[in-house]
Structures are given as C-alpha cells and as structure tokens.
Amino acid sequence: MRFPENLKKGGTIGFVAPSFGCTTEPYKSAFANAQKKWKEMGYQLDLGPNCYADHGIGISAAPEECGKELTEYYVSEKNDCLISCGGGELMCEDLDYVDFEKIRKAPAKWYLGYSDNTHFTYLLPTLCDTAAVYGPCASDFGMEPWHKSVVDAFGVLTGEVRTVRGYEGWER
C-alpha cells in the first residue's frame, strides 16, 4: 500500500467536486470560511473548475468533466493533497472518465471526502494500491470551532494524527 507524503506547512491543498460542489447554502459560506481559515494557517489553495459549478444533473458538472477534473488534479504537481467539495449521489457516473492508470503511476496523494466520495476512497486502495481517507469534505472545515473529527482528519493529512478511534455523539 502506498501512503502519501504528509501535507507540509505552507503546502497546497487542492479541491475537486466529483460529486456536489459548493454552490448552495450552507456549503458555499462554509467553504468560503474554510478557505479563509486555511489561508490563515499558511496553506495555499488550488480550486478545481467544478468547485462552484452547478450545471450537472445531480452532480457539479457533466460526468466527463468531473472525471477529468479528478484525474488532472490528482496527478497535478500544483497541489499536495485533495479534499472533495462535497458528497452527493452520482459520482458513480464519473468513474468511466477517471484515468486510474494515470493515477496509479502518479505519486501518491491524500484524498479526503465522504458519502459519494466512497467511489474514489475505495477505488484508490483497491485499484491503485494507495491509501485514502473517508472523512469530512471541504465545507466541513468551515465550522467554528472544528469538531474533533475534523481536527483528526486534517491531522491525518499533515501526519500529526496516526490513530483515530471514534467520537461521542455527532457533529452539530
């Protein structure tokens, strides 16, 4: 299993929207606040073309566009890890347009997302022998303060957290 390098201070976080983007409230405002927080923490941001797209049916853009964005941003040297903008329902339609061979040959990179993103967090390990994180999407990082699960997920990306156990209750 390939484990990606940790996100370093001052590194670049990439964002993709292979399912829903951040076009409606509360996701739009939460993603804006998350971006502000990451910049204050010293990180650079690399937003994919579908992050604010809403011309797809049940997803941010056409499946061809979503698959292309996911492939291009995963293999890009312009970002150090990827966080999905949101979950959703139809990411399964993107998979025919994701170049898993290209991704398998690229350096390992952390991918973080939940819900519909299971289509990628499951296939990265099984098809590309690369670890992925099933965890919060981009807008979740806009909450104040960060829930412990959000702190831990970011800690996995940075290498500060190696073990995650569980949480009392749920996020509010």
Question: Residue ranges of each PLM-predicted region?
Answer:
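Long, hydrophobic/aromatic-enriched structural stretches that serve as scaffold segments
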Residues: 67-68, 73-98
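Short, surface-exposed connector motifs at secondary-structure boundaries
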Residues: 12, 77-80, 101-108
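Short amphipathic alpha-helical segments
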Residues: 27-28, 94-97, 124-126
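Gly/Ser/Thr-rich loops at beta-strand to alpha-helix junctions
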Residues: 20-23, 86-91, 113-119
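Short, acidic/small-residue loops that bind anionic groups at enzyme active sites
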Residues: 98-123, 131-138
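Conserved anion/nucleotide-ligand pocket segment
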Residues: 130-172
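ATP/NTP phosphate-donor binding region
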Residues: 1-78
